[in-house]
């Protein structure tokens, strides 16, 4: 069974939950309270050094980065397939997560950081870690 470390407030967690549901995969949700800074717990940071959600554990392997998780889950659970067979359609499909990862998510992350979690992050990161996180 998959363990999904996630937060209901996380867009990235939501897209992984959506794929797990679509695939009919059995999974256990482990909620990480971002407002309380639970992502900075040393045990969680062993799984995800960037202290972000989601993270999955499948067959003892740690998988991070939500878009890569989706690709992984589509291969591990082939039915129903999420990726079309036709190369051009596969290309078109790839444009959406690329836009989300490169444009939308950084903007949302900046706002979320500024409004909701900067006090937690500032208390739990060194200045070098903050620079690396937002690089």
Stretches found by the model and what they are:
Residues 1-134:
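GST-like domain detector, emphasizing the conserved glutathione-binding G-site
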């Amino acid at each position: 069974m998959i363990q999904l470390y996630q937060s209901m407030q996380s867009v990235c967690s939501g897209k992984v939950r959506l794929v797990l549901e679509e695939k009919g995969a059995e999974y256990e949700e482990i909620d990480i309270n971002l407002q309380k800074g639970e992502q900075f717990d040393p045990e969680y940071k062993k799984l995800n050094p960037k202290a972000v959600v989601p993270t999955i554990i499948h067959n003892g392997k740690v998988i991070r980065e939500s878009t890569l998780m989706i690709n992984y889950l589509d291969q591990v659970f082939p039915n129903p397939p999420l990726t079309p067979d036709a190369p051009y359609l596969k290309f078109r499909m790839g444009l959406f997560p690329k836009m989300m990862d490169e444009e939308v998510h950084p903007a949302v992350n900046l706002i979320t950081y500024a409004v909701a979690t900067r006090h937690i992050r500032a208390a739990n990161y060194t200045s070098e870690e903050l620079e690396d996180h937002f690089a």
